[in-house]
Amino acid sequence: MTISWFGHSCFRIESKEGPSAGSGQASVLIDPFSKDIGLKPPRIKDDLVLITHNHYDHNNIEGADTQTTMIIDGPGEYEKKGVYVRGIISYHDKNKGQERGLNTIYVIKTEDIVICHMGDFGQDKFEEHQLDDIGDVDVLMLPVGGRYTIDYREAVEIASQIEPKVIIPMHYKIKDLKIDIDGPDKFIKELGLTPEKVDKYKIAKKNLPIEEMKLVLFN
């Protein structure tokens, strides 16, 4: 499996199809953004596109062929090409969505690896069912930039509750991004792990860390 990051909360996951689907490749794109945020949007060529919430920096499906691409934009259970997706309702803020609306957490299973993308999670704590619905996670994609989401301290607390094998921070300030949020440094320091820096992250079930959590930071 290969994970690529386009900036902000946008990732592409490329994996082998599930055994029941065939022997080809499957591709999942999460939270494609508008060029208005200052970054170059990815071209959509994927089997599935997941939208965590309906804001311009997460919901740009322009150019997607809806005949071949499954667009998922809310809670529920989905499957295509042996990639299994579960959407879990959450809130974009600490006031039950009254400030910024709803957010969908996605749990994706492919190649026997479980990836959780938290979207613009803004709650200060999980509701009772949410942690159970998320379940065991191998790779956690977690917002850390604050202001519109949880901040770096809250992100560390959320990570400690989910207990993933790998953490990939997202939704933080990078060059050219026009959104005013924090960079990743405070989160990295608070977490206390030295990041493995990558251009693309290649991972297999057999290579997942067993004892210690790993922090992966995209260049």
Please report, for each region that a protein language model flagged, where it lies by residue:
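Active-site-proximal beta-strand elements of phosphoester/diester hydrolases
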Residues: 2-5, 27-31, 84-91, 105-107, ...
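Binuclear metal-ion centers of metallo-dependent hydrolases, dominated by the metallo-beta-lactamase
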Residues: 3-6, 99-100, 166-219
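Divalent metal-coordination and catalytic microenvironments
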Residues: 13, 49, 53, 85, ...
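Active-site metal-binding motif and surrounding structural segment of the metallo-beta-lactamase
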Residues: 34-77, 132-141
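Portal/gating segments that form or line small-molecule/metal binding sites
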Residues: 63-116
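Active-site-proximal loop/helix segments of hydrolase catalytic cores
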Residues: 94-162
